[in-house]
Structures are given as structure tokens and as C-alpha cells.
Amino acid sequence: MDSITSAASVVAAGLAVGLGAIGPGLGQGNAAQGAVEGIARQPEAEGKIRGTLLLSFAFMESLTIYGLVVALVLLFANPFS
């Protein structure tokens, strides 16, 4: 593998992890804000809101894990070599 392909793979892996973490991070912050506001308005619905929040956190976190998997593939099982 030549040096340009190797360097591009490292940069792409960094971008995959970085950009893959920004979106879910912002989404989790917005979801938590909405959940806290919802619980403050309707304390009796806390259990339902919390369950939905945790499920949505799991879906958002899976996007970050997909970015990590792409980065690991680019670094260790490079398809471009």
C-alpha cells in the first residue's frame, strides 16, 4: 500500500469517528433536554418517558458504534490496499 492511500485511510478513520460521534452526541443532548422538560411538566409520566428515552439513546449510540466499526475497518482491514 502506498503512503497516500495509507494517509487517506487514517484521515478517513478519524473523520468517521469524529463525525460519527457529533450527531449522536447532539441528538442525545436534545433528547435528554426534552425528557427533562416532559418529566417536569408531567411527573406522573416519568416511567414512560424514561423508557422511551433509554431506547432512543440505544439507537443513537448505535450510530457512534457504526462509525467506530468503519474506522477500525479502514485502519486494520483496509479494503483499498
UniProtKB/Swiss-Prot annotation:
This protein's GO CC annotations: plasma membrane-derived thylakoid membrane; proton-transporting ATP synthase complex; proton-transporting two-sector ATPase complex, proton-transporting domain
Presence of the UniProt keyword Membrane in the record: yes
Keywords noted in UniProt: ATP synthesis, CF(0), Hydrogen ion transport, Ion transport, Lipid-binding, Membrane, Thylakoid, Transmembrane, Transmembrane helix, Transport
GO molecular function, one term: proton-transporting ATP synthase activity, rotational mechanism
Reversibly protonated during proton transport (site feature) positions: 61
Localization: Cellular thylakoid membrane
Function: F(1)F(0) ATP synthase produces ATP from ADP in the presence of a proton or sodium gradient. F-type ATPases consist of two structural domains, F(1) containing the extramembraneous catalytic core and F(0) containing the membrane proton channel, linked together by a central stalk and a peripheral stalk. During catalysis, ATP synthesis in the catalytic domain of F(1) is coupled via a rotary mechanism of the central stalk subunits to proton translocation. Key component of the F(0) channel; it plays a direct role in translocation across the membrane. A homomeric c-ring of between 10-14 subunits forms the central stalk rotor element with the F(1) delta and epsilon subunits.
Membership in a protein family: Belongs to the ATPase C chain family.
Protein name: ATP synthase subunit c
